[in-house]
Amino acid sequence: MGVFRFISISLAAVSAANAAQILSMPHAQTVPHSYIVMMKDDTSDDDFNHHQSWLQSTHTHNITRRATIQNAGMRHKYNFRKMKGYSGIFDEETIKDIAKDPKVMFVEPDTIISVNGKVEQSNVPSWGLARISNSQPGANSYVYDSSAGEGITVYSVDTGVDINHEDFEGRAIWGSNQVNDGDDRDGSGHGTHTSGTMVGKEFGIAKKAKLVAVKVLGNDGSGPTSGIVAGINWCVEHARQNGGNDKAVMNMSLGGSSSSALNRAAAQAVEQGMFLSVAAGNENQDARSSSPASEPSVCTVGSSAEDDSRSSFSNWGPALDLFAPGSNIISARPGGGSQSMSGTSMAAPHVAGLAAYLMALEGISGGAVCDRLKELGSSSITDVGPGTPTNVLISNGGAKGGNPKPAPGPSPNPSQPSEPQQPAPSQPGEPGESFPGEPFPGEPFPGEPFPGESSPGESAPAPAPMPPSPQHPHTPYPGGDNFDFDGYWKKYFGGEHWRKMFGSFWN
């Protein structure tokens, strides 16, 4: 009996020593009784399946005994090849039992993540497209290569997308709804706006890329971390089965308190070949305090204003990789038409769209894309913030062989905002709010400017009508009877043209 007691005590001591850490999130808004569990990297499929079977039995026993939590159990299961895990609603005793499994790396409370920008301002210019293709601010044309992101798929991990908006030309599809609200639409407008910047025919950078809507935030602009991790997992698997992760871009214009689970999920997506653009956040603070912006392997984006200064609301610090236009950006709105928003949420899709553009043009992918964006960008941003290692504003590098296209401008009657073709979906509460009646930390109420930004006018300008399609370099005999064949051949098929078009490969 004494020997048996000694062995029992020894096993208990070993179990306690190997117990996984249950992380605390004292400054975050948590989801009651909801947790994310991450397994150790060497966990096999068999071990994971065995753990789930054990969990079901243990959880059922604990709930039956106490019956204190409604709708408890596993909600999401994650499998990123090298990283496995799950989330769900569990009582305290079950969480303690889970942490004792030596295959568990850590347990993390599920926290609320929100969009990183939702402000409507009136009578402002649309300048972001023109800025990324011109060396100086104030230009009014967007110059781009006619490849325009063709063959690349962009995943909008956001509030959903109005996939029927005319700006997407049928290139947008609905992918997944991790909110599980039965509402496959963008009831906020945030996801449609960011998607328009990425791939829209009028507002977008990669005008020929495909778009997949992945809803991870509700119509109020917020959602649990567990659902966002599930959304990332879905994107990785969908891309792998549909063209490859090296042909995929993910945009996450969202953020919240630092989360090991969310950062690890984002890192797994990058490791498997995807490019991730992430908003730095709008609190005018060090971006290392939030996720997924603090994950080193993603491309973390700060916001710039029209005068090439850091937007007053933009986060800063060592986590930042790049800056992109984010103040007063006009893009698509649900139901048709356009609206203006500000935030690092608007900056990140500029980077995602340009990433898709460069991936199609140069054949690069994954982590190499962020490095290429740094090479092509200009050292233009002023007042970058404490500890920020970069002042680089993104640029498409003069759009090798590109064609000019005017950026969206004011409508003939600038006092009238661009209206949707049909009524926008009803919105429960003010979209983009963390709590009813309150704006996100560091953001103004809708209709008010950020501190230090220009005051709003009376209405937002509508985009200008689409100009005639720019002439493709291979369009035969432009100019009709006056066509200069020798000059045309020299311009488009001479060595200088091809050196410019493919210099990145040859030099």
From Swiss-Prot:
InterPro entries: PCSK9_ProteinaseK-like (IPR034193), Peptidase_S8/S53_dom (IPR000209), Peptidase_S8/S53_dom_sf (IPR036852), Peptidase_S8_Ser-AS (IPR023828), Peptidase_S8_subtilisin-like (IPR050131), Peptidase_S8_subtilisin-rel (IPR015500), S8pro/Inhibitor_I9 (IPR010259), S8pro/Inhibitor_I9_sf (IPR037045). It is found in: Secreted. GO terms for molecular function: serine-type endopeptidase activity. Residues 450-461 have a biased composition (Low complexity). Residues 34-113 form the Inhibitor I9 domain. Residues 175-198, 282-312, 378-486 are annotated as: Disordered. It is an enzyme of class 3 (hydrolase). The active site is at 158 (charge relay system), 190 (charge relay system), 345 (charge relay system). Residues 405-428, 438-449, 462-476 have a biased composition (Pro residues). The keyword Repeat does not apply. Belongs to the peptidase S8 family. This is Subtilisin-like protease 1. It comes from Trichophyton equinum.
